[in-house]
From Swiss-Prot:
Protein name: 18.0 kDa class I heat shock protein
Keyword annotations of the record: Cytoplasm, Stress response
Coiled coil feature spans: none
GO cellular component annotations of the record: cytoplasm
Family: Belongs to the small heat shock protein (HSP20) family.
Domain sHSP: 45-159
Subcellular location: Cytoplasm
Amino acid sequence: MSIIPSFFGSRRSNVLNPFSLDIWDPFQDYPLITSSGTSSEFGKETAAFANTHIDWKETPQAHVFKADLPGLKKEEVKVEVEEGKVLQISGERNKEKEEKNNKWHRVEFSSGKFLRRFRLPENANVDEVKAGMENGVLTVTVPKVEMKKPEVKSIHISG
């Protein structure tokens, strides 16, 4: 039991320790901002969207790109081929969330964008690219063109 009262909330604290992480949070009971300084999971969701990772897997038949885009509609995603050999995957999300209580009213607006470009190899058939979205996972398949092996002609050596 400490003889020094805790001025920093109901948790036990050591006010004399300069390295103590138990500090007073003026926003602890305020509904708009959490103790970490961010405003709910709403903004974190958009930040995760903006940092979207895309996996590129090469199979014997095709190059397959997979992007995890939870909560995104296929209308919010673009898949394009630029300059014949650059695959571009992009998306944008704008979201609004409103909460009302008898003490406060909160409206949050959030938006996020992502853009990824991949230079495709020479064996990519950009005329046959297919894309599909299922359960928040975008799959882009770029088939491979069968590369013709150079014809080798034997030359008879005389002499």
